[in-house]
């Protein structure tokens, strides 16, 4: 580099490499769908989205039938609310492993990733809300000499 950068103001003036300035291309298959995988705890969600009327199908069942708790449905719809695309995409997904809460989190992660593949301009909004990051928290393993991961057996003084 011929120019020497001494401050952050100088850094702004330097142009970013051409590879970073390229616009991301949408990833869609022949049917116009975008595919992504979402994970949370032990749950894995395979998600396909396409432009549609807002219908969400989970393992061949409607969203309201598969996730009866309103909180879980709210978690799943968060990516659409953040990107202002409610009722604009049809979602077909298969979810395996874990419980309902983990599956809902995996579905949210998968929908967020699929939305960014469908339209890369949605990525900053989803990333700012933290939907693009896989939640690393999992169940802590049980240790020997203990009742559970951290719970000790009852102590008897005598």
From Swiss-Prot:
InterPro entries: Ribosomal_Su5_D2-typ_SF, Ribosomal_uS9, Ribosomal_uS9_bac/plastid, Ribosomal_uS9_CS, Ribsml_uS5_D2-typ_fold_subgr. Residues 22-31 have a biased composition (Basic and acidic residues). GO terms for cellular component: cytosolic small ribosomal subunit. The keyword Ribosomal protein applies. Residues 16-37 are annotated as: Disordered. GO terms for biological process: translation. Gene3D superfamilies: 3.30.230.10. It comes from the Bacteria. Coiled coil: none annotated. Pfam families: Ribosomal_S9. Belongs to the universal ribosomal protein uS9 family. This is Small ribosomal subunit protein uS9. It comes from Rhodospirillum rubrum (strain ATCC 11170 / ATH 1.1.1 / DSM 467 / LMG 4362 / NCIMB 8255 / S1). The gene is rpsI.
């Amino acid at each position: 580099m011929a120019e020497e950068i001494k401050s952050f103001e100088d850094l702004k003036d330097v142009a970013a490499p051409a590879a970073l300035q390229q616009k991301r291309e949408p990833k869609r298959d022949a049917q116009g769908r975008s595919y992504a995988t979402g994970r949370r705890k032990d749950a894995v969600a395979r998600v396909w989205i396409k432009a549609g009327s807002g219908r969400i199908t989970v393992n061949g069942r409607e969203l309201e039938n598969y996730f009866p708790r309103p909180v879980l449905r709210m978690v799943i719809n968060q990516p659409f609310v953040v990107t202002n695309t409610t009722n604009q995409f049809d979602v077909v997904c298969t979810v395996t492993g874990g419980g309902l809460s983990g599956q809902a989190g995996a579905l949210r992660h998968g929908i967020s990733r699929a939305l960014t593949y469908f339209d890369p301009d949605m990525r900053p909004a989803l990333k700012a809300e933290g939907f693009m990051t896989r939640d690393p928290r999992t169940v802590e393993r049980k240790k020997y000499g203990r009742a559970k991961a951290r719970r000790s057996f009852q102590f008897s003084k005598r």
